[in-house]
Structures are given as structure tokens and as C-alpha cells.
Amino acid sequence: MREAEVFRETRETKIKLYINLDGSGNYEVNTPVGFLTHMLESFAKHGRFDLKVEAEGDVHVSHHHTVEDCGIVLGQAVLKALGDKKGIRRYGYSIIPMDEALVLSSIDISGRPLFFYEDKDLRGKITEFDFELIWEFFKGFALESRSTLHIKVLDGKILHHVAEACFKSFAITLKEAVKVEGSGVPSTKGVI
């Protein structure tokens, strides 16, 4: 079973995360940021990952540290769960709607940590959550999972819908990339 648990503690956050890449979408997520909790639950459900998250953070300062660090820890856990990466598809992509929002995402589990996004200059809050923090989450994930991740907002006006489409698209994209399709490392170099 491809699963991993990661614990990370800093002066700003304390996060324990478990993921099973071959799960069925079960989740137990507890963070001090309600919208982040909702997005992580959506990620687990639509990617069919089993996910447990216990997070504490200095939300009296900002949601930034907690959101970014959850992305970092998720990236570390996925990297650990993938092990030697033998047999994985490596690439994944999806285009997902959420009402008026439409989001494209693509990933290459390449060993080259990069993150690119286009957000149509959308700014604002979803309740108390700064929309722009989703990009910090995805950047943390991409860097720590050593993946190249692209997320492009193709359309959308309601920030909640755009953010949710991003997380659902990301989940489906990642699920596609971690699928086991063969036996060797999917690279002409022989390593990722």
C-alpha cells in the first residue's frame, strides 16, 4: 500500500498528515482554517485518497502559515508514499468545472519542483480566507513533492467556485499521475 505519514512542527504551525494514495476518499481533516478544511476534504474525496490531517497554526497572525505548511506537508507525504516511483504514470491533467468556474491543471512528477499558475487577477476573501493563499498551498505542494504543477483558471467569478474547482482539478490530476501502469521508472534517465 502506498501510504505515508509526515509530522512537521515549526514556531508557526504543527501539522500531522497521513495519506493513502490507493484509498477510497475517506478523510478526517481538522485545521483552524475552515475553508482550508473544506478544500482538503474535497481533495481527498475527488482524488479518492484517504487523508487524515491534524493542524494547528498561528491563525491569530494570518491563515498564511497554516495554509502554506499544509501544502508543504502534503507534498512531503505524497513524495514519501510514492517511494521509488516505479510504475507510476507520472503525468496527469484535468479540466474541471464548478458552476461558472473552469480550471485546468497538469502535473509531472518529474523531480523538478516548479509551480506555475494563472488566476485571471482574481482577488478577495472567501469568508475570512484570502483567495490568493491557495497558490501558496499549491506552491508548497509542488516544491516538496518535487513535481512540476500548472494550474490555470480558464473562467470564473465566484471565488469559492474557482478555489473549489482548483482543488478538485488538482485532486483528479494527481490521482491520474500516481496511477500504477507499469513496472519501471517512467523516465529515459532511469530515475525521477
From Swiss-Prot:
The keyword Transferase does not apply. Pathway: Amino-acid biosynthesis; L-histidine biosynthesis; L-histidine from 5-phospho-alpha-D-ribose 1-diphosphate: step 6/9. CDD domains: IGPD (cd07914). GO terms for biological process: L-histidine biosynthetic process. One of its GO terms (molecular function) is imidazoleglycerol-phosphate dehydratase activity. One of its GO terms (cellular component) is cytoplasm. Its main location: cytoplasm. This is Imidazoleglycerol-phosphate dehydratase. It comes from Aquifex aeolicus (strain VF5). The gene is hisB.
